[in-house]
C-alpha cells in the first residue's frame, strides 16, 4: 500500500464502494421507465439549483485563478448556469437513448437443444478519477444510472466545491425515487489519498476510468490494481495531402486548434505535404497568428513561414519533444512531410491514438490514411473536434478510450456494460 495512503482511508473508500455495490444491485433490476424518470428528475433538479452550483463553482474558479491555473484548465473548470443547463439537457438526452441493459447481443441453439444467449449487463461499480471537469460529474452520473451502474468519483481539489454542490442536488432525487444516494458518491474528502485508495480497491471497484492530462492517466494505468479503461491524452494530428482543398483546410484547422484549446480532441500538430507547403503554410500561419497561436515548426516550415512577413507571428523551432507533446494551449507543431507514407509513420509514432484528420480529395490517399492510422477515430475533411460522445449521439460520454480492449473511442451507454452468457436447457447433461 502507498505510504501516502493510510489504512483508515483505504477502509473508508472500500466501505463506500461496497455501499455503492449494494445499491447497484437494486438499480440493476430497475426497468428502463424507472431509470428514465429518475434521469428527468435529476435534470429538472439541476436546472432548479443551477445558481447554487454556479456559486460553488465561482469559489473554485477564484481559488484556481489565485493558484495560477492556466486558461485552458480554467475553461474546463467553469460550470456556470448556462453550462449547468447544457449538462441538464444532456441528462435528458440520455433518458431518450435506448437502454443497453438486457440487450441480446447474440443467441443460438446448440445441437443438443441448449439455448445460449449473450446479454448486456451493467459492469457494477465504476470508479472515475478526473480533474477540473465538473461537467463530468453530471455526465458520468447520468450514464452510470441509465446503464445500471454505481459511480464512485474523485473529481479533484480544483472542482471540489462544484462537485459537492452537484452531488448534493443528485442525492435527494435518488432517494425520492426509491434508490439509495450511495449510487453516486465522491471520495474527494480524502484528497489524493482517495484516488490512491480507489486504485488499490480491487474487488470493491469493478473498473476504473481516468480522465484528464497525460500525467494523471499514466499514473492510474501504472499504479492501479483495479482494471482500467485508459482514456487518452490527445496529441491530435491533421495532415494536409497534396490533393487537399486548401481553402477548406484553413477553417478546419482553426476550428480544431482554437475553438477549445484545453480539450483532448483539439488539434496539436499539423503535417503538410511538400508539394503544397510553399502555397499553404503562409496562409495557415497567418490565420493561426491572428488567433494568437504559437507555432513550433521544423526547419522547412520555419524557412517558408519566416519568409512571409506575417504580422504578430510567434514562430519557433520545434524540438523532438514537441512532436510528442499535448499542448492544451494556443500552440501548434507544424512539419512538412515528403509523402503520405511519411505522414502516416510520423502520426503512428507520435500520436496518443486519439483522433487524426486528413484533408484530401484523392480517394486512394484517403483510403490508405483511414486504414493505416492506428487511432480510435479518423476523420476525413473535417475538424477533430467532432470526437465527442455528445456529437456521436451518445448524449454524454464516460471518456474517449484510446485502448483496444473492451472499448475504443467515445464511450457511451453500451460501452458501460459487459456481457453475460445465459444457457436455457431442458435437462441436458454433457456426455
UniProtKB/Swiss-Prot annotation:
It is an enzyme of class 1 (oxidoreductase). GO terms for molecular function: glutamate-5-semialdehyde dehydrogenase activity; NADP binding. Pathway: Amino-acid biosynthesis; L-proline biosynthesis; L-glutamate 5-semialdehyde from L-glutamate: step 2/2. NCBIfam families: PRK00197.1 (NF001221), proA (TIGR00407). It catalyses: L-glutamate 5-semialdehyde + phosphate + NADP(+) = L-glutamyl 5-phosphate + NADPH + H(+). This is Gamma-glutamyl phosphate reductase. It is found in: Cytoplasm. Keywords: Amino-acid biosynthesis, Cytoplasm, NADP, Oxidoreductase, Proline biosynthesis. Belongs to the gamma-glutamyl phosphate reductase family. Its main location: cytoplasm. Pfam families: Aldedh (PF00171). Its EC number is 1.2.1.41. The keyword Transmembrane helix does not apply. Catalyzes the NADPH-dependent reduction of L-glutamate 5-phosphate into L-glutamate 5-semialdehyde and phosphate. The product spontaneously undergoes cyclization to form 1-pyrroline-5-carboxylate. GO terms for cellular component: cytoplasm. One of its GO terms (biological process) is L-proline biosynthetic process.
